[in-house]
Design a protein with these regions (language model features):
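A short acidic, Gly/Pro-enriched loop at the edge of an enzyme's catalytic core
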Residues: 136-146
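SAM cofactor-binding core of SAM-dependent methyltransferases
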Residues: 65, 71-136
Length: 150
């Protein structure tokens, strides 16, 4: 999958935790507003353990969904999954489909991959990046069967 995102100890707040940033290409206009990127020790552990399994990297280039998931199945792409509740529920209830989520909020990504790993969901992957960059550089034309935008 992808390399672990850069985690920096949060030394400014005085609280135990880490700072993490989504991937994005340099540009003036973004499709999102970066919310606080502070994650807890538990979320950092989720990234350490599960990002190599579920994480997809923006700068890895165009993906082949069949290779990413190890099978051919309809692909659902969800942009802006927040804390991941609905995406997790769909991945659980539709094991015949592959799901890719895109989110820039690190705590939500950490929670999603932690639960997905604990439940051994094999039909779920995630980008922590700008959706416009992912759509332009990573997802092949015609690969998406269903797009969900929040």
């Amino acid at each position: 999958m992808s390399e672990l995102p850069e985690l920096t100890p949060d030394l400014e707040s005085g609280e135990e935790g880490f700072l993490i940033k989504p991937e994005f290409k340099p540009k003036a206009i973004r499709s999102f507003v970066i919310r606080a990127g502070r994650i807890t020790v538990g979320q950092k552990n989720a990234f350490d353990t599960w990002w190599p399994v579920f994480g997809l990297g923006l700068f890895k280039g165009m993906i082949n969904p069949e290779q990413v998931f190890g099978r051919k199945a309809p692909l659902v792409l969800e942009i802006g999954f927040g804390m991941g509740d609905s995406l997790l529920e769909m991945a659980r209830n539709e094991p015949d489909k592959n799901f890719i989520g895109i989110e820039v909020h690190p705590p939500g990504v950490g929670r999603l991959i932690n639960v997905a790993g604990q439940e051994n969901l094999t039909n779920l992957r995630v980008y922590m990046a700008d959706a416009m960059d992912v759509l332009e550089d990573c997802i092949p034309d015609g690969a998406i069967d269903r797009l969900q935008l929040y």
